[in-house]
UniProtKB/Swiss-Prot annotation:
It is found in: Cytoplasm. The active site is at C377 (proton donor). The record marks H226 as: Stacks against the aromatic ring of pyridoxal phosphate and stabilizes reaction intermediates. PROSITE patterns: ODR_DC_2_1. GO terms for molecular function: ornithine decarboxylase activity. The modification N6-(pyridoxal phosphate)lysine is found at K98. Its cofactor is pyridoxal 5'-phosphate. Substrate binds at F341, D342, D378. Catalyzes the first and rate-limiting step of polyamine biosynthesis that converts ornithine into putrescine, which is the precursor for the polyamines, spermidine and spermine. Polyamines are essential for cell proliferation and are implicated in cellular processes, ranging from DNA replication to apoptosis. Pyridoxal 5'-phosphate binds at S229, G266, E296, P297, G298, R299, Y407. This is Ornithine decarboxylase. It comes from Schizosaccharomyces pombe (strain 972 / ATCC 24843). GO terms for biological process: pantothenate biosynthetic process; putrescine biosynthetic process from arginine, via ornithine.
Length: 432
């Protein structure tokens, strides 16, 4: 399908969806859309320009900031928003702030009326600071501190989740006017992060919890679930929607009038279209159109829109080893914490080798086997223990990692005195 035709189809569906959701600004009325191909070219130019400026500063004898850096394609976030509304027009996204709380990403999503999934007072404060209305926030943490519950009540943030009896008693005392979603457990055995190990009531317990909520005169308005962060099993959504239908029926039996279903997150970029088709069909089968449906996508919006560049700061060859060891200026204590916390496996690619920029070079992985270490003094700080690159690198060369927008900047630390990586933004005019 020609890119411009695909764009127009997405925009048409997005405009209809934003009208239904009451968004202030039509999605495509205020920005210039760019295709993925043009964005990739812009990313390459941003890498080249930034590195050349670093090198010019070094030649001038100025302190050169050769630290690792991201290139953030804001238009990429926007394209994913269009794609979401085209494939899941019934489902209003509430962006999972924990995934990447970058201020410009949040501002972009806020501009187009996206809701926000928050899990702490800090996230609530950040989103309210953007001028977001409290009714566009879901406090999606089933186990909240009392002080945080009080804060939510003071700010009019009413929609929140629970999965246990103690939370109900807590909410009754500190936020009795809340609108509650019962978080249920799911089969998330095929996800990167199995959230049901920690959260979610089983179907054996949901009826009891609804009885307690009824006795406390609390307003339970629906059901929420999460199939796990980074789910690779489309059938997990079908199973969770079927379970939600059972809990809706339990609520009806107890006199509740549920009108909201939160289908959580876990959406992967490469499997999204097929998963969305399944979700649309399941929602039509099990839930009347009058039921409002929201979701909590995170990585789907931001993962592919951030690319990380790291500099080779040291190189070590061992006589008895075939592999070369490279040491770079970001690692698992910084932007690549996703290796530990999100079970990701970033793929290293050569960005600059000697005087050659080779971004997006499709040479292949090559036969040069290597270790890639982060910069800290901890041996846990290993990015790859068997990477394959097409070229042997030297100190001063650059490597890049794509799909670096999810669970990277959010948890980066300054351990060992290393700074967090800066961000170079593309398409900032989209925020005007």
């Amino acid at each position: 399908m020609p890119a411009i035709m695909e764009k127009n189809m997405l925009v048409s569906e997005s405009l209809r969806t934003t009208e239904l959701l009451g968004h202030v600004k039509p999605i495509d009325s205020v920005v210039t859309w760019s295709s993925p191909g043009s964005s990739r070219q812009a990313i390459g130019e941003a890498f080249k320009n930034t590195i050349e400026e670093i090198e010019r500063a070094a030649v001038r004898g100025e302190p050169a900031d050769s630290d690792a850096f991201f290139v953030a394609d804001l238009n990429g976030v926007y394209r994913q928003l269009l794609r979401w509304h085209a494939k899941l027009p019934r489902v209003q996204p509430f962006y999972a702030v924990k995934c990447n709380p970058d201020p410009k990403v949040l501002a972009l999503l806020n501009k187009f009326g996206t809701g926000f999934d928050c899990a702490s007072k800090g996230e609530l404060e950040q989103i309210l600071g953007l001028g977001v209305s409290p009714d566009r926030i879901v406090y999606a943490n089933p186990c909240k501190a009392i002080t945080y519950v009080r804060y939510a009540a003071s700010k009019g943030i009413n929609l929140m989740t629970f999965d246990n009896a103690d939370e109900l008693y807590k909410v009754k005392q500190h936020h009795p006017n809340s609108r509650l979603l019962l978080r249920i457990s799911t089969d998330d055995s095929n996800s990167l992060c199995r959230l049901s190990l920690k959260f979610g009531a089983s179907l054996d317990d949901t009826g009891k919890l609804l009885d307690i909520a009824k006795s406390l005169e609390l307003n339970v308005v629906g059901v929420s679930f999460h199939v796990g962060s980074g789910s690779y099993d489309p059938s997990a959504f079908l199973d969770a929607i079927q379970r939600s239908r059972q809990v809706f029926d339990q609520g009806l039996e107890r006199g509740f009038n549920f009108d909201l279903l939160d289908i959580g997150g876990g959406f992967m970029n490469d499997s999204f279209d097929g998963v969305a088709d399944l979700i649309r069909s399941a929602l039509d089968t099990y839930f009347d159109p009058s039921i409002r449906v929201i979701s909590e996508p995170g990585r789907f919006f931001v993962s592919s829109s951030f690319t990380l560049a790291v500099n080779v700061i040291a190189k070590r060859k061992l006589d008895d080893e075939e592999k070369v060891m490279y040491y770079v200026n970001d690692g698992v204590y910084g932007s690549l914490n996703c290796i530990l916390f999100d079970h990701q496996h970033p793929v290293a690619r050569v960005l600059k080798c000697g005087s050659r920029f080779v971004y997006n070079d499709l040479v292949g992985t090559g036969q040069h086997r290597c270790f890639i270490w982060g910069p800290t003094c901890d041996s846990l700080d290993v990015i790859a223990n068997d990477a394959h690159l097409p070229y042997e690198l030297n100190v001063g060369d650059w490597i890049y990692f794509e799909d670096a927008g999810a669970y990277t900047v959010a948890a980066a630390s300054c351990f060992n005195g290393f700074k967090t990586s800066r961000i170079v933004y593309l398409d900032t005019d989209i925020l005007d």
